[in-house]
């Protein structure tokens, strides 16, 4: 894809251009090219763009250009549906502030120390990036002052609607000045999002990035046809074969993600899980380790991976196929970032064909199939050493032989017992003690041993 303009032409100052070049960014993406001039003009905008189009910088750069560092009030508010996305946006802003230490940004979200948040909010904070719940909590406590707010961004608005944050967003907007600039970014435009825009935005300019402008050309896509039962073995086979540098493994639910994590961790894979049941502090540690390549495999749900943007992800594994095309595009977009190449492999069972057909129809081409025939999986213990195979059970022939041998033993034993009885009857006048020592006792021991052997044999 060829981008026509650099950031200087779009109105971004040399200070931020220098920082962009230091980060390897020299040309604007379509959403950046279209949105930045409009945002700099102060107009409200609705940006319809999918993940991976560069929309974060599309609103971050003009916001930074308009911040007055001499004013200590909160001037820009960015609302995101998840903690992970809020942290991702905050990280992007901090990257741009290397040469502008006079501008301060603060992320506030659930799971943090409230007292620490209060101390920072009382300081010199120009930009706040927040999740709806914690932000509304601060508004109701009157611990955040939005009276001088000039800009608000609702990022991934459709996801906030999906998570049930619509009323929270309305309450937040009601607490902001009417003269502010409002920006709304969303991959899709449900009716409730349109109603929200109509109520709270002032003649917004619509900016769209058409689907053909969102490219997955640098991502190789494959489908592996399997069954639910064989899927774990198929996944491990591909992991061992491809040896990814960093990989994200997507599961449909938290339960399935946790189960797969236990399975892979028990087999010695360097992996971690990321989903809603993981405490926030641990989630942040996991993401930090993954970004630093200390964790090779990240097993995640769609919700937890929202906004996940990590350099060096070479593989995406759709352990469970996503149920809609938007989620598929978002998932595979975790690899092939910044123009790099990547590989996305989707494991498909017979029941998943309907979802696969929908994805292929949207992409406009079939995805390459790959068949794995009975992968050989090595079983290892907790130390990585091979576990020996259990001894095979006896065949039917062996059991029949044991049965015949048992019958013969029983027959011989009965014959000996009969002979012994006759001998005792014919020699009652003889010394019984001697007979018992010489005949009966050894025979009883021998018979008992034989019976024990036969029981064990059977």
Swiss-Prot record:
Compositionally biased region (Basic residues): 443-458
The yes or no answer to whether the keyword Hydrolase is present is: yes
Q: Which residues bind ATP?
A: 49-56
- Knockout consequences: Wild-type growth rate at 10 and 30 degrees Celsius, no change upon exposure to H(2)O(2) or diamide.
> Where is the short sequence motif DEAD box located?
155-158
| An annotated Gene Ontology molecular function | ATP binding
Spell out the protein name for this chain.
DEAD-box ATP-dependent RNA helicase CshE
Per UniProt, residues of the Helicase ATP-binding domain are: 36-207
């Amino acid at each position: 894809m060829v981008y026509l303009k650099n950031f200087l032409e779009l109105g971004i100052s040399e200070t931020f251009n220098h920082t962009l070049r230091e980060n390897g960014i020299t040309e604007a993406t379509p959403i950046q090219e279209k949105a930045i001039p409009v945002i700099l003009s102060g107009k409200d905008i609705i940006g319809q763009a999918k993940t991976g189009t560069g929309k974060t910088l599309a609103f971050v750069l003009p916001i930074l250009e308009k911040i007055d560092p001499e004013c200590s009030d909160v001037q820009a508010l960015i609302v995101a549906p998840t903690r992970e996305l809020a942290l991702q946006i905050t990280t992007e802003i901090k990257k741009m502030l290397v040469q502008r230490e006079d501008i301060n940004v603060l992320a506030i979200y659930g799971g943090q120390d409230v007292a620490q948040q209060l101390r920072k909010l009382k300081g010199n904070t120009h930009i706040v990036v927040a999740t709806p719940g914690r932000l509304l909590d601060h508004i109701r406590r009157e611990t955040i002052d939005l009276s001088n707010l000039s800009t608000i961004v609702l990022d991934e608005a459709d996801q906030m609607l999906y998570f049930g944050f619509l009323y929270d967003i309305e309450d937040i907007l009601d607490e902001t000045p009417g003269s502010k600039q409002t920006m709304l970014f969303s991959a899709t435009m449900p009716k409730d999002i349109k109603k929200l825009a109509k109520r709270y935005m002032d003649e917004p300019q619509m900016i769209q990035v058409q689907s053909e402008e969102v490219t997955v050309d640098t991502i190789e896509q494959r489908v592996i046809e399997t069954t639910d039962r064989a899927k774990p073995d198929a996944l491990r086979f591909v992991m061992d074969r491809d040896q990814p540098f960093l990989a994200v493994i997507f599961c449909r639910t938290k339960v399935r993600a946790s189960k797969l994590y236990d399975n892979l961790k028990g087999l010695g894979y360097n992996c971690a899980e990321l989903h809603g049941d993981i405490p926030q502090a641990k989630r942040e540690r996991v993401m930090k380790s993954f970004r630093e390549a200390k964790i090779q495999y990240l097993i995640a749900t769609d919700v937890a991976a929202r906004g996940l943007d990590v350099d060096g992800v070479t593989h995406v594994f759709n352990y469970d196929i996503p149920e809609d095309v938007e989620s598929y595009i978002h998932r595979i977009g975790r690899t092939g970032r910044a123009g790099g190449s990547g590989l996305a492999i989707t494991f498909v069972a017979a029941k998943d064909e309907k979802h696969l057909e929908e994805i292929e129809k949207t992409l406009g081409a079939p995805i390459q199939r790959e068949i794995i025939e009975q992968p050989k999986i090595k079983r290892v213990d907790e130390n990585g050493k091979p576990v020996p195979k259990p001894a095979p059970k006896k065949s039917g022939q062996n059991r029949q032989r044991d049965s015949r041998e048992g019958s013969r033993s029983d027959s011989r034993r009965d014959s000996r017992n009969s002979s012994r009885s006759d001998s005792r009857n014919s020699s009652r006048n003889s010394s019984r003690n001697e007979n018992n020592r010489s005949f009966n006792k050894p025979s009883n021991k021998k018979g008992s041993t034989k019976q024990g052997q036969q029981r064990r044999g059977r």
